[in-house]
Amino acid sequence: MDKKNNLVWIDLEMTGLDPQHDEIIEIATIVTDAQLNILAEGPVIAVYQPEPILAQMDAWNQKHHGASGLIERVRQSSFNTLEAEAQTLSFLEQYSEKGRSPICGNSICQDRRFLSRLMPRLEAFFHYRNLDVSTIKELVARWYPEHYFHKNTTHQALQDIRDSIDELRHYRQRIFVNPS
């Protein structure tokens, strides 16, 4: 398999939005080819966090991660942050070469900030570039609002990645059309 042009998609769920304070509680990855065809779905890992960390989550995170069942999966998880990083890297190395794929997803800079602090080996696996679907979303909302993609965010990492890939496919078909 030619790994050079594969795209690595990632999503994290966190205890909050502060990359210097909050923790990762779920990680998922998907690998696509350059045409956005899914090649493989990586492990979806709930990352154990102790009760004092979970208790610090704000009401929004408590509500959404509680309703999805993620908080309970975090409590029951046998994976710490380093183990989740190692398992994710082991999966990705089968489909991409270090430094080749941009990090892909929605609002991916936020995920990258968390990876930089908490999973630095995984963050270093990616090219320095980002493929951030939310940038395209913001431009489409302003320039082509009739083509805006509406999605139901589940705040479950794997489904959020699938939705991001679907969103980019949508924009590819409607905005990034072949000019010839």
UniProtKB/Swiss-Prot annotation:
Keyword presence, Nuclease: yes
Pfam families: RNase_T
GO molecular function: 3'-5'-RNA exonuclease activity; nucleic acid binding
Alphabetic keyword roster: Cytoplasm, Exonuclease, Hydrolase, Nuclease
A biological-process GO annotation: DNA metabolic process
Major subcellular site: cytoplasm
Matching Gene3D superfamilies: Ribonuclease H-like superfamily/Ribonuclease H
Annotated protein name in UniProt: Oligoribonuclease
Protein source organism: Dichelobacter nodosus (strain VCS1703A)
